[in-house]
Every structure is written in structure tokens, then in C-alpha cells.
Amino acid sequence: MTRLRAVLLATVIALLGACAAPTPPAEARRPMPAGQPTAGKAEVLWLGQAATRITTPGGKVIVVDPWLTTNPKTPPGFKQLSALGKVDLILVTHAHSDHLGDAPALARLTNAPIYNGGGLGQALVSLGMVPAAQAQRFGKSGTVMPFGPTGPRITAVHAEHSSELALKNPATGKDETHYGGEPVGYIIELENGFKIWHMGDTGLFGDMRLIGEVYKPDLVLIPIGGHFTMGPQEAAIAVRDLIRPRFAIPIHYQTSPQLSGTPEAFKAALGAGAAAGVIVPQPGEKVDF
């Protein structure tokens, strides 16, 4: 009888533990691209639209454009902001709701600073959405080192887009539009020298060539959906003729009917002889570099 009671008690404890424990998002990982070093790798996790989590070789976690909780492409396991785990830095490319998204809530949850181009941070502070100490402002071409001289280096660069902040004022409940700073992209240079250009939202512009020549990004995360940004044809011109990175991950597509561009159309426009390797992860899939 004592043994039966012990077995029943152990079973109950196990069931209660299973109910109490949160279910982590299922992990999917793509093999490292050929030719990449196995030491000092970086991890890129795309979560739909422009939302991206980058884990650096030194263990820093940088989240870009975290629109997650209402993003139809974000996997269910990542719609809880706590599923992102540790966050050291938040980058916002511009003020539109599908990019600013959950950044203020994530900043409050993790105490991570939000870096943004131009005046978006001041608007967030004045609206009471972000503490002033967490709203870090810098300008295009002004490289910053949030983690000190040996950590990742962040440079804001031009993006051909807009950046109005349209929202319901949390204090008044009224719909308002505020200045959202300048739209930017980010060159993120990791501790091992690997460079990522997260382009945010942008149309095609000629200085992509100059940015590519100056910063020499290894990887671009490039919008291909069209309507509000480059479509597949323009994105192919940017990658093949202007930037010439080693790798390209298409983003900002198929989230709404207007964003009709597809990775297949992007690859077809690039052509078979393109130097850049196109990687098409599913939302929630990790890619190592």
C-alpha cells in the first residue's frame, strides 16, 4: 500500500510540474551556410515581417523591429515576449506599427535600451511609453558601441521610407500621429567581424552601392514584399548590382495581401549566377553564420 501511494504521489507531482512549466517554442535550425567558420558563430532568428533576434558570438542578444504579439507570421511560441529570453539591445528601424511593434513593452520587460534613428525615442518618452534612460538616440553614419569597444558596433544608415508614429495615446485614448524620427537601416558588426545589414523598410536607392562599399555587409535582411518597400525585382537589383553581400535573407513579405512578393520571385530575379546565397528561413527558424 505504501509503495502504491508513493507511485501515485510521484505521478501527481509529475503531472503538476508539466502543467506549470511553460512550453518553449519548438526549435528549428538551418545548417550553417557552406564556407562559414564553425568558431565564433552568430545566430539569426527571423520571426516574420522584419522582426529578428540576433545572438552574437559574444552572447549578446539584439532584437530588431519586434512586432510579435499581433504579427500573423510570428510562430505562436514567440507571441509571448518572455519567449525571447534575455535581450540586451532593441533596435527600431522606424515608427510604423509593424516595426516599432512591441518594442516599448519589450524594453519594459527586459530593461534593454531602445536605439533608434532621429527623434522616435523622444516621442516614446513624451508619450510615457518608454523611460527616458532607455531611449537611446543616434544619427545616420554615427557608429555606436553599446557594449564597449570589444562588443558589437551599430551604425544607422539611410532607408528610403517614412516614419510617422500613429497610435492611440495611452494617456488620452485618442488616435494621434506624432513625429517618428527618420527611417533607418542598421549595419551590425559583430565581435568576429561578421556584418549584418538589417534594411528595415526601404525602396531602392543608388547609395546602396556606397553603403555596400563602405561597410561591406556579409548578410543583408532585405524587404521584398513590394507596395510599401522594394519588390522582388528591385531587391534583386540591390543585392546583385549594388550591395553584393555574401548572403541575403528576404523579409517583409506575405504578411498582408499588399506584400505580394515572394522569395521564389526574388531568387528568379536574381538569376542563377548571382554571387549572394539566398537563405529563406521559415518564421521561427534559426540560421547560424
From Swiss-Prot:
Pfam families tied to this protein: Lactamase_B_2
Protein name: UPF0173 metal-dependent hydrolase H16_A2129
Family: Belongs to the UPF0173 family.
Any GO MF annotation of the entry: hydrolase activity
Organism: Cupriavidus necator (strain ATCC 17699 / DSM 428 / KCTC 22496 / NCIMB 10442 / H16 / Stanier 337) (Ralstonia eutropha)
Keyword Kinase: no
Superkingdom of source: Bacteria
HAMAP family: UPF0173
Keywords for this protein: Hydrolase
